[in-house]
Amino acid sequence: MSYNLTDPYEIARYIKEAKKSTPIKAYIEGDLSNCDFTNIEKFNSGDLYILFGESEEILVIIEKNKDKIKNCRIEQDRRKSAIPLLDMLKINARIEPGATIRDKVIIGENAVIMMGAVINIGAEIGEGTMVDMNAVVGARGKLGKNVHLGAGAVVAGVLEPPSSDPCTIEDNVLIGANAVILEGIKIGKGSVVAAGSIVTTDVPENVVVAGAPAKIIKEVDVKTKDKTKLLDDLRK
């Protein structure tokens, strides 16, 4: 079944209808030689087993063979999850440990995703853009090229409350730490959002905004550009 992931209601339907998954990893010492491992990925040497699969299937095996099991350890990182995480193996970007990126996200060349960042379904991260520590890009949030999304900043998504228009951050924008960009807002090219600001209306190109709610305080000048310039070495 196909879904139009540009529509927040379609995204919600996709999540609703997705098969929920509770994958686990089990390390087992014991005799499981007579077990049926259909639908379970198994690695073993003698009586040592590593099993990957859905919790209900692996737990049935453990329960049925508990008298033959000497030791068992289970690792679990989600429950009834609707959307898998993004396969990052073929992405040409720097993605640090602890970043959480859901499937159906686009990551541009030489982007940087730092520890603790969260990027939701349908988001787009442009070439050379940095999503700093603990920043959040909500569903369908769009960040252009060479954007800096500061630590703890939030680009709101379209899901709840539902919004037909995603947040759009155009090229060469700098968003300071802990700033919040509300649903459907557009930040024009080259603009700067000061740390801690709450942006409730669209921002034109090449201006500096600050405050809660954010207001234009000046145009971007040479001094501003010097203070907010990005470091190319961080993107290589």
Swiss-Prot record:
PROSITE patterns in the cross-refs: HEXAPEP_TRANSFERASES
InterPro entries: DapH, DapH_N, Hexapep, Hexapep_transf_CS, Trans_hexapeptide_repeat, Trimer_LpxA-like_sf
Reactions catalysed: (S)-2,3,4,5-tetrahydrodipicolinate + acetyl-CoA + H2O = L-2-acetamido-6-oxoheptanedioate + CoA
SUPFAM superfamilies per record: Trimeric LpxA-like enzymes (SSF51161)
GO molecular function, one term: tetrahydrodipicolinate N-acetyltransferase activity
Pathway: Amino-acid biosynthesis; L-lysine biosynthesis via DAP pathway; LL-2,6-diaminopimelate from (S)-tetrahydrodipicolinate (acetylase route): step 1/3
Keywords from the UniProt entry: Acyltransferase, Amino-acid biosynthesis, Diaminopimelate biosynthesis, Lysine biosynthesis, Repeat, Transferase
Gene Ontology terms: biological process: diaminopimelate biosynthetic process; lysine biosynthetic process via diaminopimelate
E.C. code: 2.3.1.89
Gene3D superfamilies: Hexapeptide repeat proteins (2.160.10.10), Malonyl-CoA ACP transacylase, ACP-binding (3.30.70.250)
Function description: Catalyzes the transfer of an acetyl group from acetyl-CoA to tetrahydrodipicolinate.
NCBIfam families linked: DapD_Ac
Family assignment from sequence similarity: Belongs to the transferase hexapeptide repeat family. DapH subfamily.
Protein name listed in UniProt: 2,3,4,5-tetrahydropyridine-2,6-dicarboxylate N-acetyltransferase
Taxonomic source organism: Clostridium botulinum (strain 657 / Type Ba4)
The gene coding this protein: dapH
